[in-house]
A protein has these predicted regions:
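Surface-exposed ligand/attachment interfaces on beta-rich extracellular proteins
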Residues: 31-32, 170-173
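Acidic/polar low-complexity interaction segments
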Residues: 1-55, 59-67, 71-91, 115, ...
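Post-HExxH zinc-binding segment in Zn-dependent metallohydrolases
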Residues: 125-171
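Short, glycine-/Ser/Thr-/acidic-enriched flexible segments
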Residues: 93, 119, 142-145
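An acidic intrinsically disordered interaction segment
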Residues: 2-12, 96-106, 153-161
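Short pre-active-site segment immediately N-terminal to the catalytic Zn-binding motif
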Residues: 40, 88-105, 124-126
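Active-site recognition of the HExxH zinc-binding catalytic motif
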Residues: 103-119, 132-136, 140
Length: 173
């Protein structure tokens, strides 16, 4: 199945799976006929953000499990973390499938990091705007770019969701 240590990708409540026979030596495998690019992008992005998080918090184990990631949900132009999974809408409304944008995957998993990390400390964090900013920090750290969500919009491949290098908000200025 398209499940690893840190993510279980599902479409229509099903996890992609297939069987292959491996021979001793080098085996060339492809998942192209058994999964789609939305599933593979989500799988790769979640593993990337989990590894990035562990480089800062190696002893934090709150997300050391296969987090469900649901792709191609009904709706459009959004994604969300619900406390137990990350969820991505199908293409529509002028937006690409949100699972295709790695920054969106990093951001949603970032909500999970923030949620589980605060819980591990015995607290909760419910500030909406700050939560969005903190989730963005995980994506910004991975991409090392102030522009998040490039490729989000169908009609503008260079369009983005947020940009942090224009009209900077720096305290105390």
């Amino acid at each position: 199945s398209l499940e690893g240590r840190w993510v279980r990708v599902r479409t229509n409540n099903a996890t992609p799976s297939w069987t292959v026979n491996l021979n001793p030596g080098v085996n060339n495998l492809t998942a192209d006929n058994n999964t789609d690019i939305r599933q593979r992008t989500t799988y790769h992005a979640v593993n990337t953000v989990h590894d990035f998080m562990k480089s800062f918090y190696p002893s934090f184990t709150g997300l050391d499990f296969a987090l469900p990631a649901n792709v191609d949900l009904a709706g459009n132009c959004n994604a969300f973390y619900d406390g137990s999974s990350i969820n991505f809408y199908a293409a529509g409304g002028g937006c690409n499938a949100t699972s295709l944008v790695a920054d969106v995957c990093y951001h949603e998993y970032g909500h999970g990091i923030n949620d589980k990390f605060y819980q591990a400390q015995g607290f909760s964090f419910d500030n909406g705007a700050m939560g969005e900013g903190y989730a963005d920090i995980w994506a910004l750290g991975i991409t090392d770019s102030p522009i998040l969500g490039i490729g989000f919009y169908q009609s503008n491949p260079t369009g983005f969701v947020r940009r942090y290098d224009i009209n900077k908000k720096v305290f105390p200025q």
